Amino acid sequence: MVHVRYGGQNGEQYELAISENHIVVRTESRSSLISDRPFEAAPVSPQARNILNQFELSTRFSQAGVEVLHVKEPSHDGALRDTAREILNQEPEVQFAGRVLIDPVSQQPIVYTENLFVKFDHEEDVSFCQEILGRYGLTIKRQLEYARNAYFVSAPSNTGLAIFDISERLLNEESVELCHPELVREFRQRQAFPPQWHLKQTTIGGKTINAHANVEAAWKLSDGTGTIIAIIDDGVDIDHEEFRSSGKIVAPRDVTRKTNFPTPGNRDNHGTACAGVACGNGNFGASGVAPGAKLMPIRFVSALGSQDEADSFVWAAQNGADVISCSWGPPDGTWWDDKDPLHKQKVPLPDSTRLAMDYAINKGRNGKGCVILFAAGNGNESVDNDGYASYEKVIAVAACNDFGTRSAYSDFGTAVWCAFPSNNGNPSQTPGIWTADRTGVVGYNSGNTNLGDQAGNYTNSFGGTSSACPGAAGVAALILSRNPNLRWDEVRDIIKRSCDRIDPVGGNYNAEGRSPFYGYGRINALKAVELALPAQPEPVSIFTAVQDVPINDLQISQLSLAIANTNPIKSIKVTVDIEHTYIGDLVVSLNPPAESGVLPIILHDRKGGGADDIKQTYDEVSTPGLTALKGKIPQGTWTLEVADKAQADTGKIRSLTIELGF
């Protein structure tokens, strides 16, 4: 074993094994030693070619001009490796043939160069840094401009594995802040692995599955980089190979145990699979919808409605979460049993949790709001009975199957916002969703290839709206990665507009295009990412009326504004400034010109209780009724109408501003 330490002398130490079955080779001509076209292979002696016939290409690092070879019949003594190195190093065409490191968990090859990254303390001067490097026989290749006193240096040829010893000795120098060898691994494009039919059209068991959310196509524009997805669930295996990359895990928390270690319990498999669906790296066996997003695992296994539940949302908001995914809620009825009494239960959202959600929505993302998603439920029952998923400020996600129709168990109702692919039951073309599982034999898959992969690191049958929810959460991260300036409700609106209307016959879509089974349809990730970019600036005119108009008890007050423009409206924002000591008394409406044919639009309907004043801007996202004005001619008199519906409190209208885009 060799060791490398990132983060300085007190940073985390990583162990790497020396492979018994790999060699790394560089030729003078940079030609490959093993090629599908023999005439393109580098020229070597018959003896060397005979030994090479016992190897196969593992990976190639074109930029470095090296390739990693792996023995066809692995051994445990490294004898063939050493023989090959000895023979190849005598070949004129071979610049070097060396040993290879492997990750002891993933068994992926890692090539060490004879280069080092070294960063000295800020206060050291250049001459002192150069003196230290010279003492170790190191040559400066570059002084790095992105960090003070940082250098990329090389050791003498044939230093070999001693480069790790040099690195550790340098770290022990009082003036050295950071130091580690240059290690290179295979670079892989983000990919949808073959069983991941929910990400792209694929073939499984000879069947073409085309019921995906168009995710792989979206990665050309966004992979979620720069965003953080919080998974509130039963814990996450943060040491899983798909979450283990540097910086992937952010602000882990166990709100039940009150620790920062969200380790799953013995039977807690759910959260790891959810996290994999949302944002698995996709480097080894399963990609998440947003592979570039960071993961904030929050373990919550306390009772529904507990304070721990509320604390989960506050933790997420305070620690930088952009998206919060919740694949849990009240118990579901048995989906195939119409008589199960659980179908009828109504579970309200506690005030403590609602206020915590509101905190995340109002304060998260520097005021732009966290996007909160909930699984609609798996009881084949009304989601409207579930106070969590039906809360008006969250996105309730239903499940659709590999036929492009409703998953049999998926909850339905007016609160369903969208659908995302998941498993079905019978009939089904696939076992379900392929995603990360707790490492080894402890998760859903104990190492059975009928259940996933042989190592037990992936499951092939995750499902339910539990899988659909983090899938949709991943799309929200793709959107915010593309345009981080969006508010939470703008993200929700983009998801709505991105949806494909699936199952047009059985979906029971209403005039607005909303289905009780799919909401606005199945999310199309590519379309969502395309919609995320800000629209091109359009000509804007701003019209304002300023006048103190008294608001008396049980009376109607009005402030009018004349607009002469005759261009069709493309967008509208309405800003009101109303002083009042109890805004729960008020109904505030915007009355467009009679010539427009648009009925009064309610902006505020007795919400807010005893709070003071309404100083707010309304747009087409926050107030969908305003969309009725698109295409209308604004010419005429606009009136802000305030109706006081109760006694004891009074106030006044201060101003009305209408911003129109043409």
From Swiss-Prot:
InterPro entries listed in its UniProt record: Galactose-bd-like_sf (IPR008979), P_dom (IPR002884), Pep_S8_PrcA (IPR034054), Peptidase_S8/S53_dom (IPR000209), Peptidase_S8/S53_dom_sf (IPR036852), Peptidase_S8_Asp-AS (IPR023827), Peptidase_S8_His-AS (IPR022398), Peptidase_S8_Ser-AS (IPR023828)
The protein's name: Calcium-dependent protease
Gene designation: prcA
Domain P/Homo B: 535-662
Function: Degrades phycobiliproteins in vitro. Has a substrate specificity similar to that of trypsin.
CDD domains membership: Peptidases_S8_15 (cd07498)
Enzyme nomenclature, EC number: 3.4.21.-
A molecular function (GO) term: serine-type endopeptidase activity
GO CC aspect terms: cytoplasm; endomembrane system; intracellular membrane-bounded organelle; membrane
UniProt GO BP: protein processing
Residue stretches making up the Peptidase S8 domain: 196-529
Family: Belongs to the peptidase S8 family.
Family matches, as Pfam families: P_proprotein, Peptidase_S8
Subcellular location: Cytoplasm
Top-level class of the enzyme under EC nomenclature: hydrolase
Organism: Trichormus variabilis (strain ATCC 29413 / PCC 7937)
Active site: D233 (charge relay system), H270 (charge relay system), S466 (charge relay system)
Keywords in alphabetical order: Calcium, Cytoplasm, Hydrolase, Protease, Serine protease, Zymogen
